[in-house]
Amino acid sequence: QRQMCIRDSILNTHYIHTDRLMSEMVATVAQTMSYVIAILCFYLMHVSSFPERMKNGINYIKKHWKFLIVMFIISICASKAYEWIMELLPQSWQFNETQNELALNQLFKTPLFLPITFILIVIVGPIVEEIVFRHILIGELGKKFNFIFMGMVSAITFSLIHVSGAKSPLEFGAYFILAVILVFVYLKSNRNLASSITIHILNNLLSFMITIYTISM
């Protein structure tokens, strides 16, 4: 009877683990599809001007790639400096990873998730977030409320969205640094969406590669 209980316990644990993985997979696919639909809607709303937007975006990246690389490096250095400052604070204030990062890390633990996780985190995620937080909040609403003011709103809301489940208020700073740089690049480029998308994709690509390397060690 004891052996049966142990067997049932193992089977139940297996089923729970499988169900959780399936739920995470479904949620990841659903989120990816919703992002793809959002990008498609953006395209349909700007279908007449989209080719010109794409051309301008590509031309900007070609012409100002050095500026974009410099800003990307600055974002990395600023983030590392923030992490270093966090290490000087009392232990109770510190955090190793943000709650958002911990949640995303679950997707990396199953190889089956990696292709869809890459698409979600590195490609469609940054594009959708830049459409919402830069194009809509700054590019569109900025025409009515002032671009600088909406840039501040964009940086704050972007950071808050990513720390909604945070256990430490200091997690806000980790995302605010990236948000400020994305806003600056977007405004500096005369609101060229390709500029901030490029920085955002590079940032997420680096995080993706580091996570893969860390998990494989």
Regions found by a protein language model. Give the residues of each.
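Short, small-residue-biased leader/transition segments that mark boundaries at the very start
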Residues: 2-6
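Juxtamembrane/transmembrane-helix boundary motifs at the membrane-water interface
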Residues: 7-30, 211-217
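Juxtamembrane helix-loop-helix connectors linking adjacent transmembrane helices
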Residues: 16-24, 51-125
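Functionally critical transmembrane alpha-helices in membrane proteins and complexes, commonly lining
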Residues: 24-48
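Alpha-helical transmembrane segments
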Residues: 36-40, 75-83, 180-183
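Structural signal for the C-terminal ends of transmembrane alpha-helices
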Residues: 42-52, 185-189
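Transmembrane helix-loop-helix hairpins at the membrane interface
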Residues: 80, 109-217
